[in-house]
Amino acid sequence: MKLKKFFAGVLAAAMMLTVGATAAFATTAATTYQDQSEVEIYKHYGLEGNGTSPEETFYLVQADKKVLTGDIKDSDIPDLTALTNAPASTDGRHYVASVKFGEGGAKANDAENVGEFVVKLPTYDHVGKFEYTLQEVAGNTAGVTYRLDTIKLVVSVINDGAIRVAGVHTENEGGEKSSSFSDNKYAANTLTVSKYVSGNMGDKKTYFQFELSLEPGTANGRKNFAENYTITYPTNGSDKNTTNTIVVGGASVKFWLKSGESISIANLPEGVEWTVSELDADGKAVANGATNGVYTVSVDGANGSIVAAGASETSNKASFTNTHEGTPDMGVILDNAPYIALLAIVAIGGVALMLNKRRRDEE
């Protein structure tokens, strides 16, 4: 019994020492804060679909500030240090950070698409805990998604203003706190228009004319597009294909294809709408199921909009199939059967007469 009491006492003493050491360590750790003059906020710029993002600069502005703890008013909190290379027109907003991605900077792999905002902290005359609300400026580039949720930057000022400790909260409502976010993406894909000819009388060497137009689409509104987009024609295609680019929201483009050929237009932002038609000899659009000369035209995807995320095998494609079935002309065919039968009857009759005459002569 005495031995049990002894071990119990040793265990209790060990637990007290452990708790005391933990408390002492916590007290010591609380005094090792380092002053922060700036805060880094990491941004991932993702890619959806099959495209190349244009050069893009993202900006953060200070939208609000407030005192969480302290004896000063919200208006007395110093603003975050202003960005030196802010846009010429700020619309009265207080720009505090930017990050630039070059052409093709959007990547599907998060390890390759990271950039950072660097927010510089001001000097403080008062201790306290202050919260800054940061907002990403929504740009106007077609295909780019901008972050809508705000970012909370909390600065704790201690030791009579000598030390600034910052924490970044990029969470959505009820989400996890983080100094990194992946809300931004570039979404684009390639449009393909193809031609096919079928049927035993179909001529696969005949060229057919088409007309294509591109519009921004409801989802893109008045966003900015590239000056133009390159049309890739088939190798050794028609000499009539002389228009090499097309403008979203601009004039339509006409081109020629024969069976088995396609054109493609790459890097069209998601939501861009296309309309493409096959033209008859008079330059009029041929409807699905109608005829173009001797051909019946079947159309799949004459109208549509560019899909990036979740695109299927049939997305972003338009195909035209012209069918001509017929019976080959074999020339004039004479039916000799009646004549052959008549000759056979005459021959049989002649043989019968000859045999009958011989029989009479023998009698």
Pin down the residues of each PLM region.
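Solvent-exposed loop/turn and edge beta-strand elements of beta-rich ligand-binding domains
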Residues: 2-363
